[in-house]
Amino acid sequence: MKRNTLLALVLVILIFPTLSTAYIEFTTSINQAIPDSLVYATSAYYDGKIFLIGGENLYSTPVNSVYVYENGSWYLGPSLPFSLSSAGATVCNNTLYVVGGANSTSIFGGILEFIGNGWKVITNSMPIPVYGAIVFSYDYKIYVIGGMNYSGNSLVPPVNYIQVYNLKTNSWQIIGNAPLRLAYSAYYFNGSALFVVGGFTQSATLTSSVFVYYPENNTWISLPSLPGVEAGGVLGYYNGYMYLVGGLYYVSGAYQLGEILYYYNGTWRNTNIQEQIPTQFSTSVQIGNKLIILGGFGPGNIPSNAMQTVSIYLPPPKPQIASIASGNETITVKWYDTNASGYYITYWSNFSQKVTINVGNVTSYTIKHLKDGVTYYIQIVPYNSLGNGTPSDIISATPSSVPNPPIIKVKIGNLNATLTWYDTFNGGYPIEGYYLYVNGKGINVGNITSYVLTNLTAGELYTIELIAYNKIGNSSISSVSFIAASKANLTVTVYKKINGFLVSWNSTSKAKYILTVSKENVVLLNVSTTNTSYFVKVPFGVYNISLEAVNIVGITKYAFILIYYIQPASPTVNWSITLNTVSLNWSKVSGAEYYLIYDNGKLITNTTNTAFTFNLTIGQNEIEVYAANAYYKSAPYIINDVRNYIVVVNSTAISISVPQIKVVSGENTDAPLQTNNIDLKSAIIVITVFVIALLMILVILRERSDNYW
């Protein structure tokens, strides 16, 4: 095993026990080779083993192999159901998942779950399928940030979406955007914060940007940038130190391959050592202070089968105090282990000098022979072979024997809240009970560890105070506050307009709303909003509407079918008659999809035009014109004619002077007969017709006379 070592000086001044200088040490080594030369693979540390998943081989061909490293050797694990390259792997709730990726035919927009002897697809409906993305898990959710969504050969920008898959609800959601479009970034998630370094951004552009993302509140902050630009590296994180290994690192006009940089005190620093085999687009897992790097492009851009380790050694980090308890002339301190070789405890009071004790490699200690009623100040300092680490915060305690305050947790329900609590130290005597105060009103709840508050008022602030007591006395107060909530009850109103409809709602509780509009099982709209109305622009039709109100208590769903058509008004018809032909035309009516024309109760046509001409039948003709759509028909516009095609429209007589004309309104066909004077033109027409008829009679009589003779 080869080994290179660097001691990088870090100026950290320790208060206890004397001034000293702390160091950081990096080492690199090569371990057992992996079974195949791979690049663009993904990996995870799961069940005490290293899983190396997918990637591309020496022939740039995506593979479905899964290799497992256990007890110092590699073996072939259950293969993926299909080849994947540039996927992401994460462990959530003791389960291994593989997310996204691509192969020679497609981008995989889903998640594979490891089931011990194989893999199964649990979803394939990622909103934006990607590869080369950032993948991690938090709070039973799998996060997918950025990545590439293009399967061609052109250089296109990656995406910047934050896509989240909820393992409890089996649903995807896009919750926001990263500050940049990112792919093939180096990243590490420490359980609460995601550190992101470099990556490809616009097309083939590398970036020097460094970000921290907090999934708890979906926020980003920027850290000082790298000295150069980078993509395809891996990121380690240990005891608050972040370090970047390998990748395409371009600085001062040249690519520096295999570089190792670390971030300290607001500055990126070069360690001046490199990977023993410089790599890009490798994959890695962090196990304690060791970052294990697998595969990647090696020298000459040839996929490597190297398994390398970069180890970081630090003075121990600052210990976190777990508890401090006062007893009779004693103080017991407990702290969380920092992997130190041992610990010093220093304690003092305002009336005594400092006392330092080397307590060895333990995580609790009881200081004895103290004076009751005197406040003591205590500090823990870790140490190892590199020196003293960062001291803990100074804590104080007064020897006594009452309990420590209990730790309270609140689970908010629908107009209720469940309080649970537990003790950190009972003072050396059994806990006898608890006093519970709600907004200042207290009761003795006895020796229980949970209590349910009911009939709460939504939106009201409740302050909970809890005191534990034993036979010596009461603990100090433990306090927590919360705002009561209820499920949102919805009242929904729809206003139909010409170019769409407005969905408006009232809610009894503040919530986020998800409005979904679909038609024939096709989702046309899915929008998340905090507003209480939304205008939906769609054509006329029948739609399924779903409105969900989501808050801390739960989800309220309101669903209904909307028949989106409006009642058209009666058309206003212009008409004219030429001999036996009537011509109709009208203006377009809002809400109408087509028009119906009846003559004497018989449908003549169904037309989408605004004009129509047809021949009248002999005798009286009553014409009705309707504006209609799939669900509504207007009142008719009626044109009535008796024999000589004399027409009256909507109860308003058209002054054509022909006797014996019956007037029919648009709403009433029983109007009385009217007699009007005939004008000159009409009289000439009548006389002409009469003369022609007489001539025809004379011709017929003459023919008969000739035949007779």
Swiss-Prot record:
Superkingdom per UniProt: Archaea
What InterPro entries does the record point to?
FN3_dom, FN3_sf, Gal_Oxase/kelch_b-propeller, Ig-like_fold, Kelch-typ_b-propeller, Kelch_1, Kelch_domain_containing_8
Q: Which PROSITE patterns match?
A: FN3
* Coiled-coil intervals, chain numbering: none
Q: Which Pfam families match?
A: fn3, Kelch_KLHDC2_KLHL20_DRC7
Gene3D superfamilies in the record, alphabetically?
Answer: Immunoglobulins, Kelch-type beta propeller
The record's listing under SUPFAM superfamilies reads:
Fibronectin type III, Galactose oxidase, central domain
Q: Which UniProt keywords apply?
A: Kelch repeat, Repeat, Signal
Which parts of the chain are Kelch repeats?
A: 49-94, 96-140, 141-192, 193-240, 242-288, 290-340
- The residues the entry assigns to the signal sequence are 1-22
SMART domains recorded: FN3 (SM00060), Kelch (SM00612)
Q: Which CDD domains match?
A: FN3
Q: Where is the Fibronectin type-III domain?
A: 315-405, 406-488, 489-566, 568-643
Put simply, this protein is called Kelch domain-containing protein STK_09390
The organism encoding this protein is: Sulfurisphaera tokodaii (strain DSM 16993 / JCM 10545 / NBRC 100140 / 7)
